[in-house]
C-alpha cells in the first residue's frame, strides 16, 4: 500500500487513537464550534418533552422497560426512558450534561469508524473516513439536540457490531461474534432503524469473504427475526398499538428524491452557510430535479453492477468504496420511505458509509497514481542505463 513518508503504524496504538481523536475534535469544531457554544445552555422543545415525560412517568429502572417512551408506537428504552432516567438521577437534568454526552458520542462514533476503516485501509488512510464523519454539517441536530441521543447510540452500536463481526473472521475465539450480536441487540433497543444491519453484513461478506453461507451469517438475521416477533407481540402493545404518526410513501419518485437529498447533504459545500437545520431548501429543490435523480440512478446502477461482479474489483480500496455506498443505501432505506419527513439528521449513519466510500476511493486513486509513476520511473531508469553503456557493451 502506498503511504506517506511518516508511518503512523510505527506509533503506539494508544497514541494513534489520541491523534485520531484530536483530528475528529478539530473537524467537529470547524464544522459546528460556534453553534455548540451558542447552544450550550439551550433546551430544545423536544428535549423538554422527554424531560417532562420522564418526571411524570418514569420512577424506577423497571419503568424504563415496561412503559412506552414519550412518543407512541416506538420502543427505544435505552435512548429514551433509561437514558433520561439515569442522567436525571445523576445530574439533575442539567442540559449542559446532555450536550456534553452528545459531543462525546459524536467523537466516539467517528473514532469507532476509524477502527473499522483501519481493517480495510490501514492506520493512515482510515483517518479520512473518521474526520469526514465527525465534520459533516448535516448532523447539526445530532450535535445540538439532546433528544438525538437516540441516533447517536444506535449508530454507536451498529458500527461496533459491524466492526466486531469483521474482526471475528480472523479470530479463533467466539467472543467477537458474540459481542457483535449483543451490540446488535443494543442497537435495536436504541432505535428500530438498526434492523437493516444483517443486510449490511451480507454485502460485506459478498465483497470481502470467499463465502457467506456459514453460521456466522445466520446470527444477525436470526436476531432481527426474533426482534420483529418480540416487537409485534410484546413491545407494540406497550403503546396500546398506537400508530407512530409517521407517514410512508413507497413510490419510486419519493424514495429517489429522499435518497438523493440525503446523498447531497453529505457535502458541506451544498449546505454552507448553514441556516436551516432540518433540510436546506436548495438541497431539497436540487434533489427534486430530474438530472439529480438521474445521476443518482446512474450511481445505483453502477453499484448494482459492481456488486454483481465483485471479481472486477481488484483492490481493497475499491471494494471498500462499493461497500461504503451500499452501507449508505441500506442504512438510509428506513428513512427514504418516509413521507414529508426529509430531515438531514436521518443521514447520520448513512454518512458513515459515504465517508468509508470516499476513503476507499482516495486510497485507490493515490495507489494507482504512485504505481504508474513507479513504472514510469523504472522504465526511464532502464533507458538511461542502456544509453550510458558503451556501444560494445550493449
What does each of the following model-derived ranges do?
Residues 2-394:
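Polytopic membrane enzymes that build or remodel cell-surface glycoconjugates and lipids
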Amino acid at each position: 500500500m502506498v503511504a506517506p513518508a511518516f508511518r503512523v503504524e510505527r506509533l503506539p496504538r494508544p497514541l494513534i487513537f489520541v491523534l485520531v481523536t484530536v483530528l475528529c475534535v478539530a473537524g467537529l469544531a470547524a464544522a459546528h464550534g460556534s453553534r455548540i457554544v451558542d447552544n450550550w445552555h439551550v433546551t430544545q422543545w423536544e428535549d423538554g418533552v422527554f424531560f417532562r415525560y420522564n418526571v411524570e412517568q418514569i420512577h424506577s429502572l423497571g419503568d424504563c422497560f415496561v412503559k412506552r417512551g414519550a412518543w407512541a408506537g416506538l420502543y427505544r428504552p435505552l435512548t429514551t426512558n433509561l437514558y433520561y432516567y439515569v442522567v436525571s438521577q445523576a445530574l439533575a437534568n442539567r442540559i449542559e450534561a446532555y450536550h456534553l454526552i452528545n459531543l462525546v458520542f459524536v467523537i466516539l462514533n467517528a473514532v469507532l469508524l476509524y477502527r473499522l476503516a483501519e481493517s480495510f485501509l490501514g492506520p493512515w488512510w482510515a483517518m479520512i473516513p473518521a474526520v469526514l464523519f465527525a465534520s459533516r454539517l448535516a448532523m447539526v441536530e445530532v450535535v445540538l439536540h439532546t433528544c438525538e441521543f437516540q441516533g447517536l447510540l444506535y449508530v454507536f452500536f451498529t458500527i461496533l457490531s459491524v466492526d466486531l463481526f469483521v474482526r471475528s473472521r480472523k479470530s479463533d475465539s467466539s467472543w467477537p461474534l458474540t459481542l457483535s450480536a449483543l451490540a446488535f441487540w443494543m442497537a435495536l433497543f436504541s432505535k428500530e432503524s438498526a434492523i437493516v444491519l444483517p443486510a449490511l453484513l451480507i454485502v460485506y461478506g459478498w465483497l470481502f469473504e470467499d463465502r457467506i453461507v456459514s453460521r456466522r451469517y445466520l446470527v444477525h438475521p436470526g436476531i432481527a427475526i426474533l426482534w420483529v416477533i418480540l416487537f409485534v407481540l410484546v413491545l407494540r402493545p406497550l403503546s396500546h398499538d398506537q400508530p407512530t404518526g409517521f407517514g410512508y410513501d413507497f413510490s419510486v419518485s419519493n424514495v429517489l428524491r429522499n435518497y438523493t437529498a440525503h446523498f447531497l447533504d453529505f457535502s458541506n459545500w451544498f449546505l454552507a452557510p448553514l441556516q436551516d437545520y432540518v433540510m436546506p431548501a436548495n438541497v431539497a429543490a436540487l434533489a427534486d430535479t430530474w438530472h439529480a435523480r438521474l445521476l443518482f440512478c446512474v450511481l445505483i446502477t453502477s453499484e448494482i453492477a459492481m456488486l454483481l461482479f465483485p471479481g472486477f474489483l481488484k483492490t481493497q480500496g475499491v471494494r471498500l468504496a462499493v461497500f461504503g455506498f451500499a452501507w449508505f443505501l441500506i442504512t438510509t432505506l428506513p428513512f427514504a420511505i418516509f413521507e414529508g419527513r426529509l430531515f438531514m439528521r436521518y443521514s447520520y449513519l448513512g454518512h458513515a458509509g459515504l465517508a468509508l466510500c470516499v476513503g476507499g476511493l482516495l486510497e485507490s486513486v493515490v495507489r494507482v497514481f504512485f504505481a504508474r509513476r513507479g513504472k514510469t520511473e523504472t522504465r526511464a531508469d532502464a533507458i538511461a542505463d542502456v544509453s550510458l553503456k558503451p556501444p560494445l557493451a550493449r
